[in-house]
Amino acid sequence: MLRFVGTGASHVGLVRDHNEDAAFSSPYLALVADGVGGAAAGEVASATAAYVVAATTRAHPEQDPVVVLGDAIRRAVVDLHRGVALDPERRGMATTLTALATDGHRVVLAHIGDSRAYLLRDGQLSRVSHDHTLVQALVDSGDITAESVRHHPMRNVVMRSLHAGAGDEADLQPDIHVLDARSGDRFLVCSDGLTDMVEDRAVAHIVSTRDAETATRDLVQAALDGGGRDNVTVLVVDLLDDPQTVRLSGDGQLLGALRDPRNVVDPGTLQRP
């Protein structure tokens, strides 16, 4: 049975006064959510989305992760709406979400926003998620080069996220697809607090030359050394076919805003209509 084995870390950074990133790492799920900058209660949005997806996948560890992730994300959006109903000052809260889930046989990616997932195989690091940002759309259309993205003035404009506001339903739809994954692969899941601060070549070098724990620590430190202008969250997990390792991995690691239960909207505190 395929399972994830690795670790994660989340740091508030050197500029922000609180952490709006939330993450969860377990043998069956590696997830990062980043409260969208400037929106009210970003930490509530990210922690709630992370909690709902983690709880749902934990309850159905051997079911089709395509279905489980899709259902979980829809439930997360419902809870974001509940959060606004409980506290109207949260109106406008939103979050990215990038999650890798396995049922023991395959790995599925669910992604919305600009947090990222990467695959390391045979020493080569490649991105398996596609940013839902204005600058990525400009790259896709050929209007700017990929090399110019990190310094573009509009690089932080997110076009799709999970939110509780009005708007086009398509803006809430994540990309969900099965990855070509095999035992021995390594995955990096991270918030843009890493990728905005650290060049891709440096990220690839760290991920490919360290064990998971050291790579996680060194990636966070590299983001801080690069300026630490945002919260930074990093998960480095290896995909292994090793039941004994899975048993030793525990139920999961909670990181960032997810560590504070006050950030999670309680789905039982508001009656369904």
Sequence positions of predicted segments:
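PP2C/PPM-type serine/threonine phosphatase catalytic domain
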Residues: M1-P273
